């Protein structure tokens, strides 16, 4: 980020549009959930996009978050390093992203490492954390800590099974338009582009 110069023209417009998607209220809700979920000595960051980015940038908070969503002994990231080296921090972010995908977050909801590392798209980071919270609430396996109303519950399939007798009874039902001549028909329709014949 330090080596990147300012963007101009269309690039600047696109970046401004991306930055407008960031939600400060959502940031507060996510920070509260992460601190409550991790149940460790994680300090509350000052409000603001850049502080939120710096708080998550080394990957330790994200790794602690994904580990807290699993039962003890089944954590997907066994070793969390608090290294100051850039490639180690980026590696931890990518470990979090892989673990989130395994947990059930769709690949379309997962941000790219540079979105967080360079602060390119912090709204995408928020979307990933929201999707992770939604999956955690939906799983309802006892590992989620926090208000269930903070995240929406994802829809789950509810398959229905019909017996052969029920399927046969469904074939006996007469459709609503069968035998009716008042429904939609093509009477009076002319071909496309032809003039209407009025006599």
Swiss-Prot record:
Q: Where are the Calponin-like repeats?
A: 174-199
Keyword flag Phosphoprotein: yes
Q: Which residues form the Calponin-homology (CH) domain?
A: 24-136
Q: Which Gene Ontology MF annotations are present?
A: actin filament binding
Q: Which InterPro entries does the UniProt entry name for this protein?
A: Calponin-like (IPR050606), Calponin_repeat (IPR000557), CH_dom (IPR001715), CH_dom_sf (IPR036872), SM22_calponin (IPR003096)
Q: Which Gene3D superfamilies match?
A: Calponin-like domain
Tell me, what is an example of a GO biological process annotation in this record?
A: negative regulation of transcription by RNA polymerase II
In which domain of life is the source organism classified? Eukaryota
Please list where the region (Disordered) is annotated.
Answer: 178-199
| Skewed-composition ranges (Polar residues) | 178-188
User: So what family is this one in?
Assistant: Belongs to the calponin family.
What is this protein's name?
Answer: Transgelin-3
Q: Which organism is the protein's source? A: Rattus norvegicus
